[in-house]
Structure formats: C-alpha cells, structure tokens
Amino acid sequence: MGRTDSMPEAHGLNKLIRPLRYHEQSRQWFAILFVPLVSYFGQPRRELLIAGSVIAIIGALIRLWASGHVKKNKVLATDGPYAYVRHPLYVGNILILLGFSMASNLWWAYALMVFLILFYYPPAISYEDAKLNKIFGEEWQNWSKNIHALIPSFSGKAGSTSSEWSFKQSLFKNGEPVIVLYLIGFMYLLVTKL
C-alpha cells in the first residue's frame, strides 16, 4: 500500500505532484543531492563556513543519536531525542540542510532548502504521525500530546519506553555513520575553497 492510497483522488497538477511529495525515496534523494550540489557551487566565507559546519554537525549528531534509539514500527521510541521531539531525524535533516546552505554562502541554497522542507516535510510528518497512531494507538496519543513534531519540548513528559542507544543499530539499520562521513567529505570540499 502506497502512502497516498487512502487519500481522495487527486486531479490536475496535484495528481502529478502528490506522489512525489509522499515518496520517501524522493525526499531522501533530493536531500542527498543537495549536499554535493551546494558544496560544488559553494563560495564559502570563513565565518559562515564555521557557523554552517557547527549547525550541520549538530544535525548529523541528532540523526546519529535518534537512529540508535528508533526500532521502526516495533516499539514506539519515546526516549533519547524522542523525549524532546517526535521527529528528530527530520530535525537533524533540516539542520544539515541549513548548515550546508550557510556554509556554501549561496543565496539559492537557502531558497532550495526552504522549498525542500516545505514540499516534503509536512506530508511526511502527517503520514508518520498517522501511521504511528494506527500502530501504537493510545501509547502514541499520550506521548504525542506532550511532544511536538519538530520544535523541542522540555516538558519532561517523555513516553514509557526506555532503550539504550545502539551504534550497531545506527550503523546497520540506518547507515548513519556512513552518512556522517559523506557529510564530512562535502564539508571538506567547502573548506578547500577558502
């Protein structure tokens, strides 16, 4: 079953665009291609490169942290970064996009970043929330009342699950350490342009 199967039938341009907005691999590939694109064309300035690098590193660390906690569709992750935000992997992605936009010093990188975020993340969040609600029901509802989708909540009202962070899971289930190396490589390309 596809992500758009339960939606009302679309017409016109929406019929063409909606499958792309809800297609997970499209979102991932656009983000993966964004990094080398802005790195290749980047015209970094030292202070923006430093600030952008710090933001991108924070984003990558959030993704690394989150991926070591999530047990997709098996256990509702409510600890680690999930104690603060429902979609920490998306928060990490957004920070990585922002960091590379800043580090590249390209005006159009910001415009492309905003487009990617607004085009892909609202439907992805809506879909994920509906799916988790269907799988975990009341447990998800109780947890999501206190935890925002993207803005950290420091209410101290995390869910009931508790799991230790796992590097093995982060590496083999999500490939996060490989993604970190990928990001470091392209950030280095920007550094060489100073």
Where are these regions (language model features)?
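Membrane-anchoring alpha-helices and their flanking helix-loop junctions
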Residues: 1-79, 94-194
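Glycine-rich acyl-CoA binding loop
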Residues: 80-83, 87-93
